[in-house]
């Protein structure tokens, strides 16, 4: 399943999201959800502990001026890669 987080992690039920992640899933951070990928923050460590691939939509990171602050553990992707992930994961859950 492809999980997408589009709101600030401070306004999302992060605990429920993390409990819902399973092996084979992927998580894409987009819009304000990219805040969750800030390096050195509490949230990025919780997401990485889930052991699912973590992606952040590059245009949203750039639009927020956060390129230098994003953790190296989050893979920055463009729209084409995002579409490819939707093909690989036909089921999606938006948070």
From Swiss-Prot:
Localization per Swiss-Prot or TrEMBL: Cytoplasm
Pfam family, one: DsrH
Top-level taxon of origin: Bacteria
GO biological process: tRNA wobble position uridine thiolation
Gene3D superfamilies: DsrEFH-like
UniProt main location, coarse: cytoplasm
GO cellular component, one term: sulfurtransferase complex
SUPFAM superfamilies: DsrEFH-like
Keywords: Cytoplasm, tRNA processing
Stored HAMAP family: Thiourid_synth_B (MF_01564)
PANTHER family, alphabetized: PROTEIN TUSB
Similarity section: Belongs to the DsrH/TusB family.
Role summary: Part of a sulfur-relay system required for 2-thiolation of 5-methylaminomethyl-2-thiouridine (mnm(5)s(2)U) at tRNA wobble positions.
Subunit structure, interactors included: Heterohexamer, formed by a dimer of trimers. The hexameric TusBCD complex contains 2 copies each of TusB, TusC and TusD. The TusBCD complex interacts with TusE.
NCBIfam families referenced in this protein's UniProt entry, alphabetically: PRK13510.1 (NF010035), sulf_tusB_dsrH (TIGR03011)
Protein name: Protein TusB
């Amino acid at each position: 399943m492809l999980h997408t987080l589009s709101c600030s992690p401070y306004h999302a039920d992060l605990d429920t999201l993390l409990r819902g992640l399973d092996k084979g899933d992927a998580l894409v951070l987009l819009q304000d959800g990219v805040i969750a990928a800030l390096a050195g923050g509490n949230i990025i460590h919780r997401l990485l502990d889930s052991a699912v691939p973590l992606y952040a939509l590059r245009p949203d990171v750039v639009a927020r001026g956060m390129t230098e602050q994003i953790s190296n553990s989050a893979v920055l992707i463009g729209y084409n890669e995002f579409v490819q992930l939707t093909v690989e994961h036909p089921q999606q859950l938006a948070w």
